[in-house]
Amino acid sequence: MATNYDRYVERMRKIADIGHSIAVLNWDKETYLPKKSANMRSQQIATLSGIMHEEFTNPKFGNLLKRLNKQRNLDDDKKKNVTVTLNDYHKATKFTKRFVMQKSMAVSKCFQAWLQAREANDFRLYQKSLEELVKIKRIEAKKLGSAAEHLYDNLLDQYEPGLTVAKSDKIFNGMKKPLKKLINKINKKKAPKKNFLYKKYDKDAQWNLGIYILNEIGYDFDRGRQDISTHPFTTSFSANDVRLTTRIDE
């Protein structure tokens, strides 16, 4: 007989499958997607993002998480999984499906505008989309709660739980003095030769260097691959499918 935790795992696997499907579409968007397919791809990603949000914020799933959170017979690992998921659930329920899809579309639109602006070396092509995305992120930060000292705290917490603007300021302010000393020390040294940075290097040689380095560090090409993208990144669709991209610059 399935336990409540088994039901939790089953639900999370379904949600993860949708998330990994979105990741595949995003990977393709940044590697092989034809230019004229961008709008439809943005819609596809937004649709799946909305479905994933619905699955995750389903009240029945929320009730299951609350019951599990009160169980005392869970081991530490399972308890931690439930605690983190319940925290994410509370955050996710602050947003509507419509908002999630709107944000997804804005991110995709902003990315496409960035590609055009980068190619044309013209920030104006990117500015409007970026401003729209910043507005949406401000709304997101406000919806996440007003308890934070700084509005950006709510967004920082998504990537580094517990980090705040005050804490990050303390970290960076503490780095200023030693960094200034290091820079002064470097400036007193003889400048190294850097003409090699501006030479022309064969495309295939650059590509093969990446493959060589990946082999040297033990990267398993049966569980991943290297491709080219405008902005290099790493993504994963499962433990057996972790992909990375590189950029070639002659």
Model-predicted regions and their roles:
Residues M1-L163:
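A well-structured
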Residues K103-E250:
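Contiguous, non-catalytic segments that form substrate-binding/exosite surfaces or channel walls
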